[in-house]
Amino acid sequence: MAEERNIEFFIETIFLPQWPFKDSELCSLFGNLLDNSIEACEKIKKGKRWIKVQVEKQNRLLFLDISNSIEEKILVRGGKLITNKKDKANHGYGLKGIERIVNKYEGEMSYQVKGNLFKIIITFFLNANSG
């Protein structure tokens, strides 16, 4: 999908024998994160389009770090990311789904915007049975 849209895709990950959440939530989490990254890259008219996914574990912490190139300004209200689509009432559900999963598993989510870089970092605490 990224290749079809002229987006360079990089991935660095570890193997986890068991994720701390359900398979459907894992698909929803990564699906929404990648959909948002691809959509942001598609808006870039000039410049490099890229997405980088990193998954790493340090002791009992699991880090999901997804970064991508951007062109448009990121909208933030009350510390939350806001959709920049015209029909706001029917958009933003992907972000809400991500937040729901992060909150359900008592994770933390932060983001950074620096120039043409957007990065979202999600951290989960792993119990003794996970990974």
Can you annotate each of these PLM segments?
Residues 23-46, 99-100, 104:
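Conserved ATP-binding N-box helix of the HATPase_c
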Residues 72, 114-121:
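Glycine-rich nucleotide-binding loop
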Residues 103-116:
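Glycine-rich ATP-binding loops of the HATPase_c
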